[in-house]
Amino acid sequence: MKNKLPPFIEIYRALIATPSISATEEALDQSNADLITLLADWFKDLGFNVEVQPVPGTRNKFNMLASTGQGAGGLLLAGHTDTVPFDDGRWTRDPFTLTEHDGKLYGLGTADMKGFFAFILDALRDVDVTKLAKPLYILATADEETSMAGARYFAETTALRPDCAIIGEPTSLQPVRAHKGHISNAIRIQGQSGHSSDPARGVNAIELMHDAIGHILQLRDKLKERYHYEAFTVPYPTLNLGHIHGGDASNRICACCELHMDIRPLPGMTLNELNGLLNDALAPVSERWPGRLTVDELHPPIPGYECPPNHQLVEVVEKLLGAKTEVVNYCTEAPFIQTLCPTLVLGPGSINQAHQPDEYLETRFIKPTRELITQVIHHFCWH
């Protein structure tokens, strides 16, 4: 029952005190099972039906869906349960102890983004869920900070089709309706080693990579010329060469060279389209040197995302906040939730605090966030 729910600050404190770090390095990676159990128990106390979904391909990670109300449509409030690892030497406070000081709540996940669930639970104290005309769903996902496996799997497997969704990432309560995607690849070239005194007896992978880079830079120019979205600060897809390694000695013909690169596509560009453009760009090298060039994903790709600017969700939220929706360059789970329904990214705290030592959320966000959650529930679930 509602009177069993702890006070807002104690909910917040318990969430921060429950570690749920996501990391590609197995030694740092943690299950989110304890955090999911916390959330599930609280939502059950509020009368929600709760489903816990194991996420395949992860190290004991789970999604949670809490639901109440009947019928079609309704509202989905979503967020991720995991945090990034922390640099112990750069934190001046215990990352897992919620600390309030000078108008700020400090702790790992205060802004990005465990705190959003505390706001939802607190707002629901004043909502009679038995009187909702449409369903209300709360989604807590796993592994957003690494593979986004939780949101991907939920979107692939659910039959839910809400009217709209809000993902509570830290946007300083400024609504976001679009962002770029992210694709990161490793270009690997396998040459043939040999003594540098006889170049004809080897195939220098660095020289082949030099040729490949020239074609990749031509692709970068093509992306800049062909695709535009003026609302973005950088209004075209970017392509970055971020890391390269090859060879082991100055007197040996380089046998292997590897380049890491990324592309940040605009909304509307498909992953198949981008893969085709990259493969076409590298085709001259592949054709000249069959079997020596490969392209592999470094991370699962994230498509760009856009909520239609004239959708009711945009109009309602802009009116409630008195602020226009924005577009941003960072990535969220929105592309996957958007496959289910129109989606906005909107939550308390600043994105500038995400992944930072001494992460905090300013207490000035508490009242307006609680009010906003109550208002959107009333608008989309009561009418």
UniProtKB/Swiss-Prot annotation:
Residue numbers binding Zn(2+) 1: 80, 112, 169
Compartmental location: Cytoplasm
Keywords from the UniProt entry: Amino-acid biosynthesis, Arginine biosynthesis, Cobalt, Cytoplasm, Hydrolase, Metal-binding, Zinc
InterPro entries, alphabetized: AcOrn-deacetyl, ArgE/DapE_CS, Bact_exopeptidase_dim_dom, Peptidase_M20, Peptidase_M20_dimer, Peptidase_M20A
Record-level GO BP terms: L-arginine biosynthetic process
Cofactor note: Binds 2 Zn(2+) or Co(2+) ions per subunit.
Cofactor(s) needed by this chain: Zn(2+); Co(2+); glutathione
E.C. number: 3.5.1.16
SUPFAM superfamilies cross-referenced by the UniProt entry: Bacterial exopeptidase dimerisation domain, Zn-dependent exopeptidases
PROSITE patterns reported in the protein's UniProt record: ARGE_DAPE_CPG2_1 (PS00758), ARGE_DAPE_CPG2_2 (PS00759)
Entry annotation: catalytic residues: 82, 144
Principal location listed in the UniProt entry: cytoplasm
One MF annotation (Gene Ontology) recorded for this entry: acetylornithine deacetylase activity
Catalytic activity field: N(2)-acetyl-L-ornithine + H2O = L-ornithine + acetate
UniProt pathway: Amino-acid biosynthesis; L-arginine biosynthesis; L-ornithine from N(2)-acetyl-L-ornithine (linear): step 1/1
Gene3D superfamilies: 3.30.70.360, Zn peptidases (3.40.630.10)
Identification of the protein by name: Acetylornithine deacetylase
Organism: Escherichia coli (strain SMS-3-5 / SECEC)
